[in-house]
Swiss-Prot record:
This is Cytochrome b. A ubiquinone binds at H201. It comes from Psammomys vexillaris (Thin sand rat). The gene is MT-CYB. The lineage of its organism: Eukaryota, Metazoa, Chordata, Craniata, Vertebrata. It is found in: Mitochondrion inner membrane. It is a multi-pass membrane protein.
Length: 383
């Protein structure tokens, strides 16, 4: 009898990707976050679709339509809070996924890594445009401040800003186009995820040792499907805990006030997952310099394969690099905290020092540490 799973044109693709996929036998729970990101994307697309059925992309009715969803639509409050907090869960998983990639040297698979960086930019753009849609105070002023940064581009900057706005300020045209892009981008992200997986399955997964594990790979199912189901269950548990008990914990109270172009909030800030980049932007007094630093703070990930100096792939047996890695993580937490603080005296200098150390660790200290560790290992082996 023909094995349908292995011979059917469609099922064969699923089989090679999720069932008979040869997988390293020693990958840890840090490898769970790829599948968790898939769950997050499905949640976001599903809840977003239902929200789009009731939302109106018009400056006069956008805020009241969100209010209507929460008050009058059956389980509208649940769908809205799942979508809003789903973005936070998405970014938590995303940051851990990237952090694991840096720690274990997954960036050596350059095609997979570069598609991942493009995905990060696409997810950040989607989240930013989604934050504008409820048309609260922070939505309006966040959109105004962040889009206005493009005016720092020489010659063409102001024209680009007006072109994005569809006028001379953030208005109805801006909201309509942001809604259109916010709706279409998740489907583009889903397509890019397939490309990401395609490149990953060309090379096979990395593992904690950073060594080739072709000799002893095991099938993905049942070993890692069970592991992914456990991870997915835990994610949904903590996600629903957040949604049902602390739905506004990660939001901004200013966004419960309808947008008013005549009244600026005392402290304009983006969502928590952009605060580290926002802190880097604010730490440079020059507008163009700040924008370049903002873009580079994420684009720097593209250069990781080029500045990898060690003969070892993973940081598992590299204590100096490990120490620098955890300092970098602490540094990012400090930047996130600084981004949420008002522009005042201790915070400015802390932000500037954290920004300098962020770029220094990645571009200078980690490559030097890789060379030193190789020299130490060579010296030790010669003893």
């Amino acid at each position: 009898m023909m094995n349908l799973r292995k011979n059917h044109p469609l099922l064969k693709m699923v089989n090679h990707s999720f069932i008979d996929l040869p997988t390293p036998p020693n990958i840890s729970s840090w490898w769970n976050f790829g599948s968790l990101l898939g769950i997050c994307l499905v949640i976001q697309i599903a809840t977003g679709l239902f929200l789009a059925m009731h939302y109106t992309a018009d400056t006069t009715t956008a805020f009241s339509s969100v209010s209507h969803i929460c008050r009058d639509v059956n389980y509208g409050w649940l769908i809205r809070y799942m979508h809003a907090n789903g973005a936070s869960m998405f970014f938590i998983c995303l940051f851990i996924h990237i952090g694991r990639g840096i720690y274990y040297g997954s960036y050596i698979f350059t095609e997979t890594w570069n598609i991942g960086v493009i995905l990060l930019f696409a997810v950040m753009a989607t989240a930013f445009m989604g934050y504008v849609l409820p048309w609260g105070q922070m939505s309006f002023w966040g959109a105004t401040v962040i889009t206005n940064l493009l005016s720092a581009i020489p010659y063409i900057g102001p024209t680009i800003v007006e072109w994005i706005w569809g006028g001379f300020s953030v208005n109805k045209a801006t909201l309509t186009r942001f809604f259109a892009f916010h709706f279409i981008l998740p489907f583009i992200i889903a397509a890019l995820v397939l490309v990401h997986l395609l490149f990953l399955h060309e090379t096979g997964s990395n593992n904690p040792l950073g060594l080739n594990s072709n000799a002893d790979k095991i099938p993905f199912h049942p070993y890692y499907t069970v592991k992914d189901f456990l991870g997915g269950g835990l994610l949904i548990f903590f996600f629903m805990l957040l949604v049902l008990f602390f739905p506004d914990m990660l939001g901004d109270p200013d966004n419960y006030t309808p947008a008013n172009p005549l009244n600026t909030p005392p402290h304009i800030k983006p969502e928590w997952y952009f605060l580290f980049a926002y802190a880097i932007l604010r730490s440079i007094p020059n507008k163009l310099g700040g924008v370049l630093a903002l873009v580079l703070s994420i684009l720097i990930l593209i250069f990781l394969p080029l500045i990898h100096t060690s003969k070892q792939r993973s940081l598992m047996f590299r204590p100096i690099s490990q120490m620098l890695y955890w300092i970098l993580i602490a540094n990012l937490i400090i930047l996130t905290w600084i981004g949420g603080q008002p522009v005042g005296d201790p915070f400015i200098i802390i932000g500037q020092l954290a920004s300098i150390s962020y770029f220094s660790i990645i571009l200078i200290l980690l490559p030097i540490a890789g060379i030193i560790e190789d020299k130490l290992l060579k010296w030790y082996l010669c003893l």
